Structure formats: structure tokens, C-alpha cells
Amino acid sequence: MFPKKKFLRCFCISRGRSSNRITLESPERNIPTGLRTYTASFNYLENPTSRMLDFSTSLTPDGLPDFTQTFRLPKTPTPSRTTSPKKVIIVNPGNIKCLGVQSQTKTTYITMPLMQVVREKLSTL
């Protein structure tokens, strides 16, 4: 997956004295404590990269990320299904001659004696 020179070596776990001869001691007595010491090393190459999961960014000589990479886009856009021309078929199930003209509808009103009383009271207000 990664070249051998770029991968991070595993942490070396040791108790008491580590390989670099540092001893952790308690301040009251000069007794080495049983704490673990973790050491890690990383081999840098001439062109280091900053890695985060599957994303890599080139670094400048100052160690800052270089975002000047540009990606070439196709010159002609590929047509999508929504922009390509389509045939539209209008179905007329009721055999209506003019589709955008509304026909007049006949409405009938049924008046009851109670409705007439309500209308009279409202008209006197």
C-alpha cells in the first residue's frame, strides 16, 4: 500500500528504561516508576506529503500544503437526461377540443327556509 520508506513505524513499548536511556523517576525517591514509554520515528523523503486517510496533498519547502493543483475539465459538457430534448405526447381522454379554455359550469342553489331567515338577519345588520 505505502512505500517502505514512508510508513510510520509501530510504537515501541518498554517499561522503566527505554532504548534512549531515559529513566522516569518519582520526585520523592529515586525509584523508577512502572510507566510505559512510547517512542516513534518517521522517515522523511525529499518530497514529503501530508496524508489523511486516502487524501494526500503536496507540501511546499516551508512545510505548508500546496493547493495549486488544477484538474482539467472536459471542454464540452456531456448532455444529461434532463437537458436532452424529449418528445411530449398530450393525451386527450375526454376528446376536449380546446385544452386551455375553461367551460362554464352550471351551479344550482337550493335554499331552505332556515337559510332565508339567516340571510334576512344578515342583511339587516
UniProtKB/Swiss-Prot annotation:
It comes from Squash leaf curl virus. Pathogenicity determinant. May act as a suppressor of RNA-mediated gene silencing, also known as post-transcriptional gene silencing (PTGS), a mechanism of plant viral defense that limits the accumulation of viral RNAs. The lineage of its organism: Viruses, Monodnaviria, Shotokuvirae, Cressdnaviricota, Repensiviricetes. Belongs to the geminiviridae protein AC4/C4 family. GO terms for biological process: symbiont-mediated suppression of host innate immune response. This is Protein AC4. Keywords: Host-virus interaction, Inhibition of host innate immune response by virus, Suppressor of RNA silencing, Viral immunoevasion. It comes from the Viruses.
